Design a protein with these regions (language model features):
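A glycine/threonine-rich phosphate-anchoring loop and its flanking beta-alpha core
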Residues: 6-96
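Active-site segments that bind and position negatively charged phosphate/pyrophosphate groups
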Residues: 91-171
Length: 171
């Protein structure tokens, strides 16, 4: 980042982080969201994604269904604290979200077309940070809970991934 190197990403699992301009970094045990620069290209080979561990695909699914809580949290922050709120990313996510949820079992079984839906919505969610200039599009209270687990569970950390923790916090 500091050297401003240009990079591209070749995805091995569906994930919204590939298309964001931020990075969650642990610094002295505390998670911080830092500004990063965007990849010049993000490439998704659905055959590769269909072979990723099922647990990671489920984590990606969980990390995008948090849209419901993130949107409500962000809107409440706007109404109560006058923070900026932009609904545009949610209009874009709505184009695919219901179909993705209906295809959850097909995603779990590695169906290429269903994985394409998950991948598309993950990319859109990540890209939402580019035109809103905030991670609020898909990261609010549920992500805070996940980061809290990572920072403070120490020896009793359950070994769950970020997406798994976000999914549980969303429920």
């Amino acid at each position: 980042f500091l050297e401003k190197k240009v990079y591209s990403v070749f995805a091995t699992t569906p994930m919204n982080a590939y298309t964001t301009g931020t990075a969650s970094i642990s610094f002295k045990g505390i998670k911080k969201s830092l500004v990063a620069h965007y990849a010049q290209g993000v490439f998704f080979d659905l055959e590769v994604l269909s072979k990723c561990p099922k647990r990671l695909t489920a984590a990606a699914f969980a990390d995008v269904i948090c849209r419901t809580t993130a949107q409500v949290d962000w809107l409440m922050s706007h109404k109560l604290l006058n923070t900026d709120y932009q609904p545009t990313p949610y209009y874009l996510l709505a184009l695919y979200e219901n179909e993705m949820i209906k295809n959850a079992s097909s995603i779990a079984s590695g169906d290429i077309n269903a994985l394409a839906l998950l991948t598309r919505i993950s990319a859109i969610m990540g890209l939402g940070t580019s035109f809103t200039q905030t991670t609020h599009v898909g990261s609010m209270g549920e992500h805070g809970i996940s980061h809290y687990i990572d920072m403070f569970a120490k020896d009793i950390h359950p070994g769950t991934s970020h997406g798994e923790q976000v999914g549980i916090a969303t429920i």
